[in-house]
Amino acid sequence: WIMGHMVNKIEQINEFLDLGANSIEVDIAFDELGYPEYTYHGVPCDCKRYCTKSEKIDDFIEALSAATTPGNPKFRKELTLVVFDLKTGGFDASRMYKSGKAFAELIQFSYWKGSDDAGRAYIVLSLPKLDHYEFIKAFREHFDTSTFKNLLEERVGYDFSGNEDMGLTRVVLNKAGVNDREHVWQGDGITNCILRSLDRVKAAVAIRDSATGYINKVYFWTIQAYSSVRDALNAEVDGIMTNEPDVITNVLKEDAFKDRFRLATYWDNPWETFKR
């Protein structure tokens, strides 16, 4: 998966897809009560990027639904996966559960449109800290009595992006109601302004490939240097988050990689661990 980073304006959806992305990351900002309010990253972010682009949340989700609904004039078949980078650090932790419920309602009614046929992209809920796990718990429990529980079970995955201890990550996911390998993505990375070793990525890949692991997919963020992309692919990641998707597509065409990797399509399940 080529994961376009910081896609927070509606026009950026097509911009990143046209550059070769098949996935996008969207930053979700909340009000002080924990209700999703708009798309926004803010500073600091990445080198050579504007960090303050924003849309009202309802407008962006409406456009995202259109881009991922077959038959819609704005449908883009390339867009198979959306990572919601949930900026949950801006409100009191006591509101985490209610915030998760509110975001579940937004996805059900504004993205899925209360239908099995709209908003087909797979979703990863990405939280910045392990102690925000009640957001995931609430999101899942919203669908316990819903006729759309099948969409939760088919289309939603989970990630913690704060580079915290992976053994503890497993425990916290279980506390949130997520079983081992139940749609678990594990990210590792840092802003593109700083070089980061692949040690933690390799540890995550080892857990993913272990018979007793809890991870389905591993991704690295945020890179666009050709050498860094090659190193990440050689570490056997499943996804790369980037500001320059065309760099990833160029590397995938190189002799060393063209027979080892290909772009994921909608028919590639992001919850299944790939076995070579």
From Swiss-Prot:
UniProt enzyme class: lyase
Main location: secreted
Signal peptide: none
Cofactors required: Mg(2+)
UniProt keyword annotations, A-Z: Cytolysis, Dermonecrotic toxin, Disulfide bond, Hemolysis, Lipid degradation, Lipid metabolism, Lyase, Magnesium, Metal-binding, Secreted, Toxin
Free-text remark on how the cofactor is bound: Binds 1 Mg(2+) ion per subunit.
GO BP: killing of cells of another organism; lipid catabolic process
GO MF terms, alphabetically ordered: lyase activity; metal ion binding; phosphoric diester hydrolase activity; toxin activity
Catalytic reactions on record: an N-(acyl)-sphingosylphosphocholine = an N-(acyl)-sphingosyl-1,3-cyclic phosphate + choline; an N-(acyl)-sphingosylphosphoethanolamine = an N-(acyl)-sphingosyl-1,3-cyclic phosphate + ethanolamine; a 1-acyl-sn-glycero-3-phosphocholine = a 1-acyl-sn-glycero-2,3-cyclic phosphate + choline; a 1-acyl-sn-glycero-3-phosphoethanolamine = a 1-acyl-sn-glycero-2,3-cyclic phosphate + ethanolamine
The keyword Lyase appears for this protein: yes
Compartments, record wording: Secreted
Tissue: Expressed by the venom gland.
Amino-acid positions noted as binding Mg(2+) in the UniProt annotation, renumbered to this chain: E25, D27, D85
E.C. code: 4.6.1.-
GO cellular component: extracellular region
InterPro entries per the UniProt record, alphabetical: PLC-like_Pdiesterase_TIM-brl
Disulfide bonds: C45-C51, C47-C193
Statement: the UniProt record of this protein carries the keyword Disulfide bond: yes
Active site: H5, H41 (nucleophile)
Function: Dermonecrotic toxins cleave the phosphodiester linkage between the phosphate and headgroup of certain phospholipids (sphingolipid and lysolipid substrates), forming an alcohol (often choline) and a cyclic phosphate. This toxin acts on sphingomyelin (SM). It may also act on ceramide phosphoethanolamine (CPE), lysophosphatidylcholine (LPC) and lysophosphatidylethanolamine (LPE), but not on lysophosphatidylserine (LPS), and lysophosphatidylglycerol (LPG). It acts by transphosphatidylation, releasing exclusively cyclic phosphate products as second products.
Family per similarity comment: Belongs to the arthropod phospholipase D family. Class II subfamily.
Entry protein name: Dermonecrotic toxin LlSicTox-alphaIV2iv
Organism name: Loxosceles laeta
Classification lineage: Eukaryota, Metazoa, Ecdysozoa, Arthropoda, Chelicerata
